[in-house]
Amino acid sequence: MRKIFVFMFLLIIPLACIPFSQQESFDDKAGTQVAIALTANALDATVSALENTIEPTVDDQPDIQPTDSPPFDPTQELGDPAYTDDSSSWTSWNVDPGDQILESVTTISVSDGKLSMQSSQVGKFHWWLNYREIDNAYLEAIFETGNCAGNDEYGLVFRSPDYFNGVGYYFTLTCDGKFDLREKTDPNSLIQDNQLRFGMQTSSLINSGPNQKNTLGVWMNGETIRLYINNQFLDEITDAKLKSQGHFGLFIYAKKTPGFKISLDQISYWTINN
């Protein structure tokens, strides 16, 4: 028995001296890669770097679907308007030339061929609607401001189901050159800042200050609403909560200037046929 044990011991010693090949270090082969992901929509395209991700192969990349790009100026594609009000009419607004209609602190009137609203006090929001209703359409209006300052607001109302509860969309400009889209869906709610979809963005396309003219345009088609200023695209939403036809008109919100006045020189709409 002792002899067998010695023999096995002598056999193990040389085997222990035989080198085994070592695995190559994973850390020596691994590297850091950066993948670039591109996202795009009808408004703009942004590029962001995503660190510590594996670069996708061609087979892994999703198919890019074409988008419906906003037209530069919708009126160039839609032809003649279906409806226009200007200095020769204003018969669809329940106000006649020479009238002075007082609603709370706001006076609505027609003079010098323009439909005007003027607020004698600050802090009052007032709208005035056309009796017509439109569905999918492009709506455009030429506004002129009087004396104003800062965050005095004015603009277009659309998709308003009735005259009284204020439900609808409000394409808003301020005297100091900001824009937004107010979405008021609750008839029992007051006008609030949390109804604003864009957070009051500044735009160089807006002619800011008193005694200025701006052309406001709204493309409304189902859940898509696009905003235009002076015939150039501003921004859009694609999840509009109010999608049914409704009245349209103008509004004024004197937040800084007593006596703030706006005038509507012309308003037109074009029907969008899907």
Where are these regions (language model features)?
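Ser/Thr-rich, Proline-interspersed low-complexity disordered segments
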Residues: 17-84
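Short, tryptophan-glycine- and acidic/Ser/Thr-enriched carbohydrate-recognition patches
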Residues: 81-105
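Extracellular beta-strand elements of beta-rich domains used
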Residues: 87, 265-269
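Short tryptophan-centered beta-strand motifs in secreted/extracellular beta-sheet-rich domains
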Residues: 87, 139-141, 207-227
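Short carbohydrate-recognition loop motifs
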Residues: 104-125, 251
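Secretory/extracellular carbohydrate-interaction modules
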Residues: 119-190
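Short, aromatic/His-centered strand-loop micro-motif at the edge of beta-sheets
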Residues: 189-217
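Flexible glycan-contacting loops in extracellular carbohydrate-active proteins
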Residues: 237-265
